[in-house]
Amino acid sequence: MENKYIKTYDNVLTKDQCNQLIQKFEISTDQQVRTEMMNHRYFTEININQHKDWEGFVLNLYDIFRPYVETYKKDCNITYNQWPEKYGFEQMRFKKYNPDGKDEFKSHVDVGDYASARRFLVFFLYLDDNEEGQTGFDEYDIKVKPEPGRLLMFPPTWTYLHTAYKPVKKPKYIIGSYLHYI
């Protein structure tokens, strides 16, 4: 099944650029935080906006994402009166899901309370290929396969329940952010 507002864009980054980001993540062990919420979400992450040594990467990624906002609007036939005149990016989180049978983010939405209600568009940038570890939208029978440089964009609201499935053979690396109302 297809959904008008779930879009992917390939080759947003090259494989080399993706590998550089993964290598930087792996050597930044002192910045990594383990997230574990019983029976719901398990992964290791870095909020890369909070670390000076990631600043160049962050600015570059924002520059890369900006044209895709316009592409997304065009591809979804979004008109000027449907889109905020001003918006900003949320801080970026770099996540690693290990193939340990545990790491996943079970079915959820990305707007669940007042604090997250500013979000209106999700960005997931996949950094490696993975036979498993898809992002699934079960209601729409859509599974997005991780590929290096693939960008997934969709609304974060209750109509877009999604799951980060467990990787099986190797880790899955993604960078995520959101567009915010300002």
How should each PLM-predicted stretch be described?
Residues 82-101:
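Acidic, glycine-rich loop-and-strand cores that form catalytic or ligand-binding grooves
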Residues 104-112:
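Histidine-centered catalytic micro-motifs
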Residues 1-86:
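Non-heme Fe(II)/2-oxoglutarate
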Residues 94-99, 113-131:
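Short, conserved beta-strand element in jelly-roll/cupin
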Residues 25, 98, 111, 127, ...:
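Short beta-strand segments enriched in hydrophobic/aromatic residues
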Residues 119, 130-182:
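Catalytic core of Fe(II)/2-oxoglutarate
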